[in-house]
Amino acid sequence: MQSGVKVSPVNMEERAKLGLKAGDKPMDLVFHGGSGSLLTEIRESLDYGVVKMNIDTDTQYAFTRPVIDHAFKNYDGVLKIDGEVGNKKAYDPRAWGKLAEAGMAARIVKACEDLRSTGTTLNK
């Protein structure tokens, strides 16, 4: 999924060069608009000192997509039409909520892998 915001590792490289007297990566950079970026762009940005990447759009989509899939697959059970009661198993939030949580969890795992943070800790 591509968003309207694109990362520009070249800009990050130029910013990092401004502080070369302070070391190779003189600034901790935040990657705003990281959702939809290519893995190569993410990795290149990390090499220039990015320590945080915002993926709000990706995580919102990862949470919402399974809910919509569930609603479409269980359309007749989710809706109460013309006085019918529907199917409680279809519209119970515990059913579609688990799917949403699993979608979010999978996206967070992917983000950790993309950002090279899997298996690391801040408190070494």
Features from the language model and the residues they span:
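Generic structural signal for well-ordered alpha-helices
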Residues: 8-12, 42, 108-112
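Glycine-rich beta-alpha junction loops
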Residues: 33-37, 57-60
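Catalytic cores of alpha/beta
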Residues: 34-48
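Hydrophobic faces of well-ordered beta-strands that scaffold small-molecule active sites
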Residues: 27-33, 51-55
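Short low-complexity, flexible loop/linker segments enriched in glycine and/or proline
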Residues: 67-71
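Extended, intrinsically disordered, low-complexity segments
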Residues: 72-124
